[in-house]
Amino acid sequence: MANYFNTLNLRQQLDQLGKCRFMGRDEFADEASYLKGKKVVIVGCGAQGLNQGLNMRDSGLDIAYALRAEAIAEKRASWRKATENGFTVGTYEDLIPQADLIVNLTPDKQHSAVVQAVQPLMKQGAALGYSHGFNIVEVGEQIRKDITVVMVAPKCPGTEVREEYKRGFGVPTLIAVHPENDPKGEGMAIAKAWAAATGGHRAGVLQSSFVAEVKSDLMGEQTILCGMLQAGSLLGFDKLVSEGTDPAYAEKLIQFGWETITEALKQGGITLMMDRLSNPAKLRAYALSEQLKGIMAPLFQKHMDDIISGEFSGGMMADWANDDVKLLTWREETGKTAFENAPQFDGKIAEQEYFDNGVLMVAMVKAGVELAFETMVSSGIIEESAYYESLHELPLIANTIARKRLYEMNVVISDTAEYGNYLFANAAVPLLKGAFMASLQPGDLGKAVAGTEVDNAQLRDVNEAIRNHPIETVGHTLRGYMKDMKRIAVAG
């Protein structure tokens, strides 16, 4: 199999990278009706598999779970989750032949084996669904020509997909039809019905492509969503402790600071996040973010280039074939860091204190979000896609760190995201550890910025620069569809 993206000519590559249209709510008037009366079989019962299935069943669809025979015989976690929630569970041979739509929600590294196992069992004219297009785009999986291939990609972890649905809402979602596999022209109808069944149509749906989803998703998770948070956590904690800060306080400021800071980002973009700072602190955070962007732009561009070319996916798949040696080594190294093993702080940190004492963290968020967005857009990805894969998902990932530090983040995200996270963080930490971290001033981290003097013209110009960044323009529009988003509880 060959990387699908690399088989396309330049015009086709640009066309698929740039495929992105915000769909009107009227396009979902029929909601999930296209799939009602059809048999939907989900392969895999992890976070996405279980929670999408629960939503789809509550939307009136006929849902069952196909698991490997050994998972059923040994009553593994996937079998327990499906059966405890009252779903029909069977082997591939039991359920796949009758299915109208098979939804593959297993981890990326299992996709080829799963597809090769289920494809011979699929009836003529059935549909195959994904929530991430890595197997199609990067692996280049060949699907039978009578099979329709679609994607519905919620832009949240599976637990959030369920919680938002239970609130009567949903999470923003990308949908796509593989252009090589739409023999009956029904792919979009299937994808729309599936998205509606998960509740995604209530939060906004982007009609995208497999290519655009994969390339933007990989870029976001490697850089700002995971890699920047991991690098910032390790660098920030070590800096605080080296300057005499109580390790327990330093750990809490970092662990819960990302969540608190990005909650403002979620509600009002970079503008609101920066407005939570005093005027002197805002000017300092802006200056630090511009400095960070200058230092890190080549690293962001390298990650984007390696994603576009297939260099990243090739390296990761080689590690799959080598029993995940790199991934497991990096995971172990992260677990041994001082931040991961610091004592817990018993005291309370007020919400505003996270901003006042976390100016560097605010600067890192601003720099990372803008760089990821700018790099994706300059590579042909449309602004709406770039927004969802950078700013939108950041509070959700920060929330995982608040639960159990970096360990929890790396458990919750996919192995693909975790591998990319380590690649980025392992390069970003030494890049910033020397001159940049040494140049920090009192008030950048751990203490509030001293002084109250502000130049009016400078503040005016900085405010205009923040508010006029393209991600703020597109974000204002897209957040309008998400006014019912629940607030993530911030720690004290």
From Swiss-Prot:
Broad enzyme group: oxidoreductase
Cofactor-binding details, from the entry: Binds 2 magnesium ions per subunit.
Swiss-Prot/TrEMBL catalytic activity: (2R)-2,3-dihydroxy-3-methylbutanoate + NADP(+) = (2S)-2-acetolactate + NADPH + H(+); (2R,3R)-2,3-dihydroxy-3-methylpentanoate + NADP(+) = (S)-2-ethyl-2-hydroxy-3-oxobutanoate + NADPH + H(+)
GO biological process terms held by the UniProt record: isoleucine biosynthetic process; L-valine biosynthetic process
KARI N-terminal Rossmann domain sequence ranges: 14-208
Residues given in the record as NADP(+) binding sites: C45, G46, A47, Q48, R68, R76, S78, D108, K109, Q110, G158
Binding annotation for substrate: S414
Domain (KARI C-terminal knotted): residue spans on this chain: 209-344, 345-485
Cofactor: Mg(2+)
Active site positions, chain numbering: H132
GO molecular function, one term: magnesium ion binding
InterPro entries: 6-PGluconate_DH-like_C_sf (IPR008927), 6PGD_dom2 (IPR013328), KARI (IPR013023), KARI_C (IPR000506), KARI_N (IPR013116), NAD(P)-bd_dom_sf (IPR036291)
Ligand binding (Mg(2+) 1): D217, E221
EC numbers on record: 1.1.1.86
Residues bound to Mg(2+) 2: D217, E389, E393
Pathway annotation: Amino-acid biosynthesis; L-isoleucine biosynthesis; L-isoleucine from 2-oxobutanoate: step 2/4; Amino-acid biosynthesis; L-valine biosynthesis; L-valine from pyruvate: step 2/4
Pfam families per the UniProt record, alphabetical: KARI_C (PF01450), KARI_N (PF07991)
Keyword Metal-binding applies: yes
Gene3D superfamilies named in the record: N-(1-d-carboxylethyl)-l-norvaline Dehydrogenase, domain 2, NAD(P)-binding Rossmann-like Domain
The keyword Zinc appears for this protein: no
Family the entry assigns: Belongs to the ketol-acid reductoisomerase family.
PANTHER family in the cross-refs: KETOL-ACID REDUCTOISOMERASE, MITOCHONDRIAL (PTHR21371:SF1)
Function: Involved in the biosynthesis of branched-chain amino acids (BCAA). Catalyzes an alkyl-migration followed by a ketol-acid reduction of (S)-2-acetolactate (S2AL) to yield (R)-2,3-dihydroxy-isovalerate. In the isomerase reaction, S2AL is rearranged via a Mg-dependent methyl migration to produce 3-hydroxy-3-methyl-2-ketobutyrate (HMKB). In the reductase reaction, this 2-ketoacid undergoes a metal-dependent reduction by NADPH to yield (R)-2,3-dihydroxy-isovalerate.
Protein name: Ketol-acid reductoisomerase (NADP(+))
